[in-house]
């Protein structure tokens, strides 16, 4: 039976880990044991934060809409309720963009929402 030397495969594996650990602080970037655990942890954070990112952005959009709508004398909850009753289906991402960049359009939407709530 021939002797199997695994230098090439282990070097390739280590190289892969070190590539993922690039930019890490201290030993975590250049010793395999520390780098492996740091990369594994970073992947866990990656997975978790891809989910959290969606929540964070939705919260940001809601804050922007709320700020824009309150300037026009209405609360976020009443505004969303009014839009629903008026049959206007615009998602929060677009509404926040409108609130930031197009105040006239937001004002028109608020008026529509108020009219729908009054009816």
Swiss-Prot record:
Give this protein's Gene Ontology molecular function annotations. rRNA binding; structural constituent of ribosome
GO cellular component terms, semicolon-separated: ribonucleoprotein complex; ribosome
Please list the GO biological process terms of this entry. ribosomal large subunit assembly; translation
Q: Which Pfam families match?
A: Ribosomal_L20
Highest taxon above the source species = Bacteria
Keywords noted in UniProt: Ribonucleoprotein, Ribosomal protein, RNA-binding, rRNA-binding
* Ranges in a coiled coil: none
Task: Name the InterPro entries on file.
Answer: Ribosomal_bL20 (IPR005813), RIBOSOMAL_L20_CS (IPR049946), Ribosomal_protein_bL20_C (IPR035566)
Task: Name the family the entry cites.
Answer: Belongs to the bacterial ribosomal protein bL20 family.
What this protein is reported to do is described as: Binds directly to 23S ribosomal RNA and is necessary for the in vitro assembly process of the 50S ribosomal subunit. It is not involved in the protein synthesizing functions of that subunit.
The molecule here is called Large ribosomal subunit protein bL20
Species assigned in the record: Azorhizobium caulinodans (strain ATCC 43989 / DSM 5975 / JCM 20966 / LMG 6465 / NBRC 14845 / NCIMB 13405 / ORS 571)
Task: Give me the gene this protein comes from.
Answer: rplT
């Amino acid at each position: 039976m021939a002797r199997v030397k695994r230098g090439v495969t282990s070097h390739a594996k280590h190289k892969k880990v070190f590539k993922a650990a690039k930019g890490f602080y201290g030993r975590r970037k250049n010793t395999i044991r520390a780098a492996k655990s740091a990369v594994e942890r970073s992947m866990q954070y990656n997975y978790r934060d891809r989910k959290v990112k969606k929540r964070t952005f939705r919260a940001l959009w809601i804050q922007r809409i709320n700020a824009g709508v309150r300037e026009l004398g209405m609360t976020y909850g009443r505004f969303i309720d009014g839009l629903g009753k008026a049959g206007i289906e615009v998602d929060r991402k677009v509404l926040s963009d409108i609130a930031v960049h197009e105040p006239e359009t937001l004002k028109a939407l608020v008026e529509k929402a108020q009219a729908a709530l009054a009816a």
